[in-house]
Every structure is written in C-alpha cells, then in structure tokens.
Amino acid sequence: DYIKMMRENMVDGIILGTHMLAETEYQNLDLPIVALDYRVAEDIPTIYSDHNKGGLLAAGEILKNDCKCVLNVTAVVTDKSPSINRHRVFSETLKKNGVKCIDYTWDTKQKTEDYYQQMNELFDKYPEMDAMFSEDLIIMNALKCAGERGMHIPDEFKTVGYDGTLIAKMSYPSMTYISQPIKELADTLVDVLLKKINGAK
C-alpha cells in the first residue's frame, strides 16, 4: 500500500530505515530517497555513523578488562550495511592483541521472543566465553542468561552493547554500550533529503 501511495505522488521523499524491496523498486519510484545504514543503490545516499570507531571503542573496553574468549555476535550478513565494519574492526583488533574472538552470525529469522533460547544455546556451545559484543537487544538476552547461570557480572562475564537504545539504558544488570549519535544521524538524513527534494524542484 505504501508503494502505491508513493507512486501516486502522495509523498515528496523517502527516508529508508529498513530495506524491504529490490533495488530497482526504489529506483523506479523516481522520488528523492535517503537510506539509513544500508547501501540500496549507487544513486541513493547512505547515512551512517563511524562504525570503525565504534568497533575500536568496543574492543578497547574488552581489552582493558583482560577478557580471554570473546563472542562477536553480528546480525548483519551483507556488505551493503556499513555496520558490518564495526564487527570486522572489533574482531581484528582483539585478534591482533592475542585475544580469542569467535565471530558468530545471529539468526535474525527467529522471532524476538525466541532470542533468549538462541542465547542459551550459545552459552552451551561456548562455555569458555567470558565476554560478548553485539547490539543492545542481543546483549540484554546475554546478560539474562549469564545471570541465571550464576555468572557474576561484570567480573565473570563482560558485555559491550552497540546503539545506546532505551533497552541498553534500562538493562539490569547495567550494560556497557557504545551510543550511536542518533540526533546527528536524524538531522543529516533530513538535511540530505530536503536538499534532494529542493534540487528536484
């Protein structure tokens, strides 16, 4: 329905927060489009934060806590998303410093309510794990699993979340996290889109 609405020129432009259609579908809309954290097509601007810096900050947090076996959990499976770079940088930094880092791709096809079960399976599979890096929602489930297994947080299990969402701020035990500059990203998205709209006119 929203594609029909856009094709009938009921909107002046689009900010893509999620990628749902084929690239050609967006290009055929003939509307100004800006994407958040996903490279839809060469002619569609992509706005994203400094994921390399985010990966370095997260790795630094792990290194200063002398962790031995770290799980690097990503829900990103494509190079089209710049966010995959934070996990690459994180993993490379730990390995260069002699820390065991296991790179794991999260099954995003599962429902959110099934994340806890998937996390429990990870703890069973990697009993030597003493730290984890991932997005806030996944880390929240990790903290719950670790606590229920009697692990002392953060002495026995260290986590670093990424995004700085409300979930991270309300987490218990409290979560260490890297915040994305949400306001700056939003301002840039709107600014770029308005320039495209005005340019088109």
Can you say where each PLM-predicted feature lies in the sequence?
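Structural motif
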Residues: D1-E8, G55-L56, I102-Y126
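Amphipathic helical "hinge" segments at domain boundaries
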Residues: D1-G13, R88-L94
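Flexible loop/turn connectors
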Residues: N120, K125-F133, L137-K201
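Flexible loop/hinge segments that line or gate small-molecule binding clefts
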Residues: G17-L57, D163-M175
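Hydrophobic alpha-helical segments within soluble ligand-binding/sensing domains
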Residues: I47-N72, T112-N120, Q180-N198
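An alpha-beta-alpha
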Residues: A58-V99, K201
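Short acidic capping loops at alpha-helix termini that bridge into adjacent secondary structure
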Residues: C69, C101-D103, I153-K158
